[in-house]
């Protein structure tokens, strides 16, 4: 049994699909692992309420943090509000295997504090254009896993997945990335496999 849960940080711009991915991960992993979630919103608990409404987990396993300012600060420079939520979940559910920390919508420069997150997943979406990977920034270049989401929209926005693939390889070097469409679960198994392997999770 893990003494401390694996903490997976999910970041990315507003509307990229972070909450949809968090929901999909909860639904896929909740029967395998002792799991909880912390969400970040600036002035509301909208993402937490979305997860509760969609029965991602039991409501008491989801804590919504209102950051009241720049979402970047709450996951990086002053992560205390998130660290307290993580500690609260640890006290509430001894023996947690995994805590997902979903950041508020942020910009390309946002990163998670190492104090808060053991693994980081950064989600971007195709509708922002195929130039996004080459814009770089810590989320795109340094996250443990980059998820390029909403690939079904590529034809509608004139985005080339080949260009995104090439640029992601160039910007990330050896770091992995996944193309996904969370509406139909495409790419989800690869993301889960990455979390389990890199986080050394073993199902009960």
From Swiss-Prot:
Q: What GO cellular-component annotations does this UniProt entry give?
A: cytoplasm
InterPro entries on file: CobW/HypB/UreG_nucleotide-bd, P-loop_NTPase, UreG
What is the top-level taxon of the source organism? Bacteria
Task: From the UniProt record, give one GO term of the biological process aspect.
Answer: urea catabolic process
- Name one molecular function that GO assigns to this entry: GTP binding
Mostly located where? cytoplasm
Q: Which Pfam families match?
A: cobW
Q: Where is the signal peptide?
A: none
Binding sites annotated in the UniProt record for GTP: 12-19
Question: According to its UniProt record, where is this protein located?
Answer: Cytoplasm
Q: Which residues form a coiled coil?
A: none
Subunit structure, interactors included: Homodimer. UreD, UreF and UreG form a complex that acts as a GTP-hydrolysis-dependent molecular chaperone, activating the urease apoprotein by helping to assemble the nickel containing metallocenter of UreC. The UreE protein probably delivers the nickel.
Q: What role does it play?
A: Facilitates the functional incorporation of the urease nickel metallocenter. This process requires GTP hydrolysis, probably effectuated by UreG.
What is the name listed in the Swiss-Prot or TrEMBL entry for this protein?
Answer: Urease accessory protein UreG
Q: Which organism is it from?
A: Stutzerimonas stutzeri (strain A1501)
């Amino acid at each position: 049994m893990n003494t401390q849960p694996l903490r997976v940080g999910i970041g990315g711009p507003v509307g990229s699909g972070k909450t949809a991915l968090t929901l999909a991960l909860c639904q896929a992993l909740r029967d395998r692992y002792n799991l909880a979630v912390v969400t970040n919103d600036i002035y509301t608990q909208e993402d937490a309420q979305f997860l509760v409404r969609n029965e991602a987990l039991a409501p008491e396993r989801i804590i919504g943090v209102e950051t009241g300012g720049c979402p970047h600060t709450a996951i990086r420079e002053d992560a205390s509000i998130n660290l307290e939520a993580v500690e609260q979940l640890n006290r509430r559910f001894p023996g947690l295997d995994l805590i997902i920390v979903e950041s508020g919508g942020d910009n390309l420069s946002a990163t998670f504090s190492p104090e808060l997150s053991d693994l980081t997943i950064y989600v971007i979406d195709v509708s922002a254009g195929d130039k996004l990977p080459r814009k770089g920034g810590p989320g795109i270049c340094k996250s443990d896993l980059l998820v390029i989401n909403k690939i079904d929209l590529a034809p509608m926005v004139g985005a080339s997945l080949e260009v995104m693939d090439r640029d992601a390889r160039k910007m990330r070097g050896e770091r992995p990335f996944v193309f996904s469409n969370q509406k139909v679960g495409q790419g989800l198994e690869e993301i889960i496999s990455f979390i389990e392997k890199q986080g050394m999770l073993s199902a009960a």
